[in-house]
A protein has these predicted regions:
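Hydrophobic faces of well-ordered beta-strands that scaffold small-molecule active sites
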Residues: 60-62, 90
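A short helix->loop->beta-strand "cap" motif at the edges of active sites that frequently abuts
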Residues: 52-59, 134-138
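Conserved phosphate/ATP/ADP-binding segment of small-molecule kinases
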Residues: 70-163
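Conserved post-catalytic alpha-helical subdomain immediately downstream of the catalytic base
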Residues: 169-200
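Conserved N-terminal subdomain of the carbohydrate kinase-like
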Residues: 1-36, 60
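Short, small-residue-enriched loops and turns at beta-alpha junctions
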Residues: 8-10, 37-38, 67-71, 147-150
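Active-site beta-loop-alpha junctions enriched in small/polar residues
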Residues: 5, 34, 65-69, 95, ...
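Catalytic-core regions built around general acid/base machinery
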Residues: 44-57, 79-86
């Protein structure tokens, strides 16, 4: 699924694309951390789009989506550090330890480097440190998975918004397909914010 070397997306030269015109008429830009991992061209495109979007006053959401098959933890962290000053809504970046100075992290998939199933207090502390370091953030959200078996999981979400950390109830369900779960969470959050839903 990550065999994207030498794909049209990875190899394309975006330097001739008028990003300002491309974003005309839009209020919101959502980007994924998978795109910049594909090639230097793609990482430059993402940073350029972030800058142009903020210049045009768009709301920007960013989902870190770290994939160890695409780039290293250090590469991902360095890139996301450049992105965060332009981001309003943040998803999927906690594994990078971007709220900390030290470089402690696990090998391989760094999702193992932070609590996979944090308490409310742990999550609130992480959110607060993020906001102190990146005061431009308006919302931070993550979902937490509890795997009971290969076919049954539970999910809940945490969100920091307007100075408060919120925790959802726990939902247990039978899995039909694991593909796109994080994207579904992101799209649901974006829809809710566009329609002024209350945090809970």
């Amino acid at each position: 699924i990550y065999d994207r070397k030498h794909s049209a997306m990875a190899e394309y030269d975006f330097s001739d694309v008028d990003l300002g015109a491309l974003l005309d008429g839009f209020d919101w830009l959502h980007l994924s951390g998978i795109t910049p991992a594909l090639s230097p061209n793609c990482s430059k495109l993402v940073l350029d789009m972030l800058r142009v979007a903020k210049e045009k006053g768009l709301t920007v959401s960013f989902d870190g989506n770290f994939r160890s098959m695409l780039w290293s933890w250090e590469e991902a962290r360095d890139f996301c550090t450049q992105c965060l000053p332009y981001v309003d809504i943040l998803l999927g970046i906690e594994p990078y330890h971007l709220w900390r100075d030290e470089d402690d992290h696990s090998q391989g998939d760094v999702k193992d480097g932070v609590p996979m199933q944090p308490s409310y207090e742990q999550q609130d502390e992480i959110f607060q440190r993020f906001v102190e370091r990146y005061p431009n953030l308006k919302c931070i959200a993550r979902h937490v998975r509890y795997a009971h078996s290969g076919s049954e999981n539970s999910l809940k979400a945490f969100m920091w918004y307007d100075g408060h950390t919120f925790e959802s109830k726990l939902f247990t369900f039978t899995i039909l397909d694991r593909v796109g779960g994080g994207d579904a969470f992101a799209s649901g959050l974006i829809y809710a914010m566009l329609h002024d839903y209350k945090p809970m």
